[in-house]
């Protein structure tokens, strides 16, 4: 029996990187899948790659109204939802003097407010024993240079996974978190790092990881798959760190 056979699933930020790979693994395990994205090109590519059975929707994680619309679309498509992987996010690393209020608010809107209000909007849609997986980051634990706002958003999401686990347990909703270390994904490419400097930065980052390399979306998706499946039914409010040992070097 496939691990997610017949499960109705939602993956936000599912058109590239960890989200796209998770969608592929969910499909391989028998799930029905909805993914969201914001970039039209990425949406089109994901639709072509995942096939016609997958519903690919545009949804801006920064918009509370969009989260309500997404929850309604999920209800219309499935009736109820068994699994939600809330993966949509942005990663901006800057020194404190370069931050503006607009940039600060955008980071918290996408990374914190969006998933919070999506969970709220999905409450009437969740099936009994639903599983929610939040994508956080080892940045929630590590005081890395220039990561102040990004790390704060991920620490908020990690705490949300614990506090909402307690609050929603009586409703039969399990919430857990996966915290990746440095992973080779398009999100990393969007940091605005000059190409000439990127190779050196990659080597410097890899040197902080005991296993000596970046992780892959496939490796993170396997942890998400476990938390989404009934195999993790006794796991509530927990965090799976997938970081190649990065936290050993705090």
Task: For the regions a language model picked out, list residue spans one by one.
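Conserved glycine-rich cofactor-binding loop
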Residues: 8, 15-16
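Substrate-binding pocket helix/loop in short-chain dehydrogenase/reductase
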Residues: 95-96, 100-108, 205
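Active-site loop immediately N-terminal to the catalytic Tyr-X3-Lys motif
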Residues: 97, 142-148, 170, 212, ...
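Active-site helix of classical SDR
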Residues: 119, 153, 161
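Alpha-helical segment proximal to the catalytic Tyr-Lys
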Residues: 124, 166-170, 233
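Residue(s) in the substrate-gating loop at a strand-loop-helix junction
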Residues: 137
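Short C-terminal tail/terminal secondary-structure segment
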Residues: 142, 225, 232, 236-250
């Amino acid at each position: 029996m496939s691990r997610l056979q017949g499960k109705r699933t939602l993956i936000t930020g599912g058109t590239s990187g960890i989200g796209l790979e998770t969608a592929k693994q969910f499909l391989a395990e028998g799930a029905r899948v909805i993914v969201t994205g914001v970039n039209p090109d990425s949406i089109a590519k994901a639709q072509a790659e995942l096939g016609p059975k997958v519903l690919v929707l545009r949804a801006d994680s920064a918009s509370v109204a969009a989260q309500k619309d997404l929850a309604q679309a999920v209800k219309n498509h499935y009736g109820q939802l068994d699994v939600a992987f809330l993966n949509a996010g942005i990663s901006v690393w800057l020194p404190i003097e370069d931050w503006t209020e607009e940039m600060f608010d955008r980071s918290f809107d996408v990374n914190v407010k969006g998933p919070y209000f999506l969970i709220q909007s999905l409450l009437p849609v969740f099936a009994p024993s639903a599983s929610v997986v939040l994508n956080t980051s080892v940045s929630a634990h590590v005081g890395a240079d220039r990561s102040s706002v990004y790390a704060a958003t991920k620490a908020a999401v990690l705490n949300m996974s614990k506090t909402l686990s307690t609050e929603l347990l009586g409703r039969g909703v399990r919430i857990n978190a996966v915290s990746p270390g440095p992973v080779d994904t398009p999100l990393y490419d969007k940091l605005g790092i000059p190409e000439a400097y990127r190779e050196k930065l990659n080597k410097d980052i890899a040197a902080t990881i005991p296993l000596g390399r970046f992780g892959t979306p496939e490796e993170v998706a396997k942890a998400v798959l476990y938390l989404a499946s009934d195999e993790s039914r006794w796991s509530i409010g927990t965090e799976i760190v997938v970081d190649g040992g990065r936290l050993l070097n705090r």
